[in-house]
Amino acid sequence: MSETIPKKPLKKGSLVFVDKNIYDKSIEALASDSDLPAYIFEGPGEILGIKEEYAQVRWRRPVPDVWFKLDQLKEYLASE
C-alpha cells in the first residue's frame, strides 16, 4: 500500500523559491527581462499575501516585492 504525503498549499508566511523550469515556459517570462537574479531560484522568499492565483513574495534583500503565479513557486526546504 503506497501512500503519498499530500502537498501542503502555499500560504502567507511560507518560504518559497521560483521553479526555473516552470517560470521559463510561462507567459510572464516572455514579458520580463530574461536575465533574472539567481536568488529568486535559490530562495528563500517569503509569501506576504495571496490574491487568486498570485502570491506577493519578499526576498531577504533590499529589492522590491514581486508577484508570481502560485504554480511557479515551490516550498523552500532548508537543508541542514
Curated annotation (Swiss-Prot):
The keyword Translocase applies. InterPro entries: NdhO. It holds the Pfam family NdhO. GO terms for cellular component: plasma membrane-derived thylakoid membrane. GO terms for molecular function: oxidoreductase activity, acting on NAD(P)H, quinone or similar compound as acceptor; quinone binding. It catalyses: a plastoquinone + NADH + (n+1) H(+)(in) = a plastoquinol + NAD(+) + n H(+)(out); a plastoquinone + NADPH + (n+1) H(+)(in) = a plastoquinol + NADP(+) + n H(+)(out). It is a peripheral membrane protein. Keywords: Membrane, NAD, NADP, Plastoquinone, Quinone, Thylakoid, Translocase, Transport. Its EC number is 7.1.1.-. It is found in: Cellular thylakoid membrane. Coiled coil: none annotated. Disulfide bonds: none annotated. NDH-1 can be composed of about 15 different subunits; different subcomplexes with different compositions have been identified which probably have different functions. NDH-1 shuttles electrons from an unknown electron donor, via FMN and iron-sulfur (Fe-S) centers, to quinones in the respiratory and/or the photosynthetic chain. The immediate electron acceptor for the enzyme in this species is believed to be plastoquinone. Couples the redox reaction to proton translocation, and thus conserves the redox energy in a proton gradient. Cyanobacterial NDH-1 also plays a role in inorganic carbon-concentration. Belongs to the complex I NdhO subunit family. This is NAD(P)H-quinone oxidoreductase subunit O. It comes from Prochlorococcus marinus (strain MIT 9515). The lineage of its organism: Bacteria, Bacillati, Cyanobacteriota, Cyanophyceae, Synechococcales. The gene is ndhO.
